[in-house]
Structure formats: C-alpha cells, structure tokens
C-alpha cells in the first residue's frame, strides 16, 4: 500500500474528514515521526510497534559495478520492531 492509497482508504472510512484533511494529517504525522527519529529519539505505538535508530558499524563493502573494495562509514539507519498485537495478527495469516 502506498501513501496515496492509505490516504484514499482512510478518507473513504472517515466521513467527517475530507481527503485533503486526511492527507494533511498523514503528512504531518510522518513529518513528526521523521523529526523525532532525526533527533535520536524512539517512537513507540503500543500494539503496533516501535521505530528507533540502529547503528551500522563501519565496514568494507564492494562496488557492484567494478568489484573494487570500498570503505563504508558507520551510520544510523531507521529500524522498525513490530509490537505483539501486530505480530500476532500477521502470524494468524500463516496459521
């Protein structure tokens, strides 16, 4: 599901909000989440999951075109850990 598909689906389910209001709310929520992670903080949505930053240590990589070794710097990457409720709902699909 893309962001525009999510907005469309929510707009049809929320008759009290216009599609533009739903779009604005989604964009603002995503922006706030990005700013929170950018500040190094963790986001926890109970039952859904948590977003945090994980550090990837410096390593030696390989340029896929040339095959030469390339030193890669350490960096922080966004990480999502599903919550118990979400994990159980997804697991129920496989049962």
From Swiss-Prot:
Pfam families: Bac_DNA_binding (PF00216). CDD domains: IHF_B (cd13836). One of its GO terms (molecular function) is structural constituent of chromatin. GO terms for biological process: DNA recombination; regulation of DNA-templated transcription; regulation of translation. The keyword Manganese does not apply. InterPro entries: Hist_DNA-bd (IPR000119), Histone-like_DNA-bd_CS (IPR020816), IHF-like_DNA-bd_dom_sf (IPR010992), IHF_beta (IPR005685). One of its GO terms (cellular component) is chromosome. This protein is one of the two subunits of integration host factor, a specific DNA-binding protein that functions in genetic recombination as well as in transcriptional and translational control. Belongs to the bacterial histone-like protein family. NCBIfam families: hip, PRK00199.1. This is Integration host factor subunit beta.
